[in-house]
Amino acid sequence: MRQITRDQMVELLSHPIFRQIGRVADEMGVECYVVGGFVRDLYLERPSKDIDCVVVGSGIAVAQALGKQLGRGAHVSVFRNFGTAQVKWRGTEVEFVGARRESYQRDSRKPIVEDGTLEDDLDRRDFTINALAVCLNEGRFGELVDRFQGLLDMEDRIIATPLDPDITFSDDPLRMMRCVRFATQLRFQIEEETAEALTRNAERISIISQERIIDELNKIVAAPQPSIGFVELSRCGLLPLIFPELSKLEGVETRNGRAHKDNFYHTLEVLDNVAQQTDNLWLRWAALLHDIGKPRSKRWEPVAGWTFHNHNYIGSRMVTDIFRRMKLPLDERMKYVQKLVDLHMRPIAIADAEVTDSAVRRLLFEAGEDIDDLMTLCEADITSKNQMKKQRFLDNFRLVREKLADLQARDNYRTWQNPITGEEIMQTFGLQPCKEIGILKQLVKDAIWESVIPNTHEAAREYMLQKAEEMGLKPAND
């Protein structure tokens, strides 16, 4: 965190719109402050595009007057139901609201709102680091108002609430998710009383819509080190309420002196590994869900010990229900996550044995355009503390990647389509839709995958005719 003098703050607010806002506020005889995350991010040297202004008076009136003064190119949107307005000008967006005092009923996070002072408005902020305000009026331009020692908390890298955290979280339980999200994004510690209040109020999350919860959860998944957030969600008791499938991965069971690894912490390690490689949100979700089927597939076998057979397939089948319940997209993004969860054991199985062309070709056929992401996930999944074992897998993965590149250079297997279509089979043998069509297509597909025949239509058709004859099928024109 950097130190900012008032003169330096004036320089940081050099965009002409800030001075213009101050002049309009002076003309209208009201105080106006830029507040919240924008001010916080100035101190933390983080990019911030959200500019929020609080007016001790009518935020809508100031926004409308500002729009008139800015003239052509300025666009003002008014949201009277919320008492807010937005001004867009030269690529900059500023939100205006009047200073407010809020109170809540226990069964709702919708506040009862009254006009208030700047102090009232800062009192209702979620965290001290977001309760900062900088005056834009001409005589006090650049002056910081830090009512709750937010700067000190930033220096100490602490998330704390301005008022009693139990009231803060009970009034608006979404703030619990925001608390964990900020701690994750900023890598701050949650202050002790605030952390205890999270645990006491966790059940209150039930009144929050799933859409609001998943918005915060996605921000945790997208953070530089997402595991921070999931460890905290587990600690405070929110995780089993919002993501029970992930919570069930926690813990280690021992039998006859043999234990399995804690699949929750393994999953978080895989997620962090993926996060170091990519910002792809849905690849991160695939990492988060890659072992989600393990609790349902867990078995004890006297010789083998703990097993999780077919956990990848079981997990891929769980993805749809998880996405539907959590209000995640039920489109190609979900199918992408399903595919990676289902296939994530394939490269590991190949790397644990001899890396053959046919095995790599089959993998490439199944993964298609997502093969690189699948390999990234699988490499992240190697979290063994046995460095020799880990290095052996990584060396074999490198060989798999080399063979993938070689196969791709020879033939575009990523977008592979079976040279033999069902329509061609029906026309050749005069068939109506039947199971024999699928059998022949699969036989041709397997033959190409196993390098029995070349990946050409001519070879595939000849092979199809041969197999059809063995099945007792004859061409229609014979």
Regions found by a protein language model. Give the residues of each.
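Catalytic cores of the polymerase beta-like nucleotidyltransferase superfamily
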Residues: 1-478
